[in-house]
Amino acid sequence: MSSYENHQALHSLTLGKSTDYRDTYDASLLQGVPRSLNRDPLGLTADNLPFHGADIWTLYELSWLNAKGLPQVAVGHVELDYTSVNLIESKSFKLYLNSFNQTRFDSWEDVRQTLERDLRACAQGEVSVALYQLDELEGQPIAHLHGTCIDNQDIEIDHYDFNADYLQNATSGEKVVEETLVSHLLKSNCLITHQPDWGSIQIQYRGRKIDREKLLRYLVSFRHHNEFHEQCVERIFSDILRLCQPEELSVYARYTRRGGLDINPWRSNCNFQPSTGRLVRQ
């Protein structure tokens, strides 16, 4: 259980509650969650964050009416800067997007600008939005996370509660290595509803070699952990940085979609460019 799971700031969220689905535009449906809720317990302050990054969202269920009333469909790509005061709560994002369904817009650019404006206001930070017609994305191959997969280890695990101590003494030798490690076994749970969140994670670092068994045990320990996607990625970054002390570190997770949305947060303290292609489970 997260230390802030019952925080007052979460009580007003529509997440986990019965809600009406509106099909006419309503920006008030968007709800933000303060990033400070998970950053404060990690000792992270807004003016001294050890990383940069973004939350990348893919919007698969986006539709509205053009000026003549003809339905339009698009795939949206949203990037929410890590410095924003709030992250966007995903159910509220879904409800907000539903409110476009029977709303007329003069152009695709009007839709894009509306999304960008409203998301910036909710997040209290920088947001960029791009919209794609379906034929622009057709035929794109399924992507994969570059790196060495650490999942096929012959180890026995019987503890699934979060424990950062798996990373204690997880480095060895004095030689500096550069590695990119990947796991598809990341599973955590929604902070509010405790529904499962499934993801793949890429960890790229430069530093003393990290023991892959200990790293995998650490990642599997998220299996009963309740936090939002973005919060899990920042926790993983912070734990590896603190306990393994790499010179450079990037953590990137791509989660399976829910409600027509997938969330793909990344955090890095070096020059890192995330690949944004859809993975096989997305």
From Swiss-Prot:
Pfam families: QueF, QueF_N. NADPH binds at S90, K91, R258, G259. Catalyzes the NADPH-dependent reduction of 7-cyano-7-deazaguanine (preQ0) to 7-aminomethyl-7-deazaguanine (preQ1). Disulfide bonds: none annotated. The keyword Lyase does not apply. Keywords: Cytoplasm, NADP, Oxidoreductase, Queuosine biosynthesis. Pathway: tRNA modification; tRNA-queuosine biosynthesis. Its main location: cytoplasm. GO terms for molecular function: preQ1 synthase activity. Substrate binds at I88, E89, S90, H229, E230. Homodimer. This is NADPH-dependent 7-cyano-7-deazaguanine reductase.
